[in-house]
Amino acid sequence: MNQRKSYRVPNLVIAGRVALAFVAVGLLSLPSLPAAGVAVVLIVVVIAMDGLDGILARKLGVMSDFGAVLDITADRIVEHIFWIYFAVAHQVGVWVPLVIMTRSFVVDTVRGMAFAHGKTAFGGATMMRSSVTRFLTASRFMRNLYGVSKTAAFVLLGLLMAEARANAEGGFVVPPAALGALESLADLAVVVTVALCLARGVPVVLDSRDYLFERPEPASGSGNA
């Protein structure tokens, strides 16, 4: 496999994740219990595919800064797709996607500024300055914890929508006695996910202060004659 084709493999995985996220919300929108069930499975698949492109890139020897940026962009799109949909479906308050999206735009803006200075979000050229901020933003533990919390939130919200479809058909997915517990778990997962999202975003802004408050150099030839 030549190098150009090798680059396509992880990029196709990234594109596939985004496409499956759209398919999942499309299925959740249908008034069908089987469709909702398939959507919940797809949510798990989409989140599980998060690190697959990176694994393939390392195995094929085609890791690049562009690939890392593309992966982060796909993460944002997938997150926003689900949060916006669940807000529209009245499963979460509108404040959730507003907070998540605001954090995403701010963090990605400062990361873009750091990238212009040769710094990356993760890896050897990371923009993170201290061990604490590197732990919060780039450690495997925090990334896995955030991934698990997102998966739990999206799956539980999807199950609640599947339950609504089942109720409309005169049945149920979750025993009625356990429905209240499921709703509470979903609410908790959402709050924890938002909190982790902010906890991983604030350090990025703090560690990029040199780029945010950089004083522009005067243009050459400027000054009084």
Language-model segments: what does each one mean?
Residues 2-14, 18-21, 41, 72-225:
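A feature for the membrane-embedded catalytic helix bundles of lipid/isoprenoid biosynthetic enzymes
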Residues 36-44:
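Structural signature of hydrophobic alpha-helical transmembrane segments
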Residues 54, 64-68, 75:
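Aspartate-rich (DDxxD/NDxxD/DxxxD) Mg2+/diphosphate-binding motifs
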Residues 45-46, 67, 99:
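Active-site alpha-helix of zinc metalloproteases
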Residues 50, 71:
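Conserved G/P- and acidic residue-centered "switch" motifs that form tight phosphate/ATP-binding loops
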Residues 24-35:
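Short, hydrophobic transmembrane alpha-helix segments
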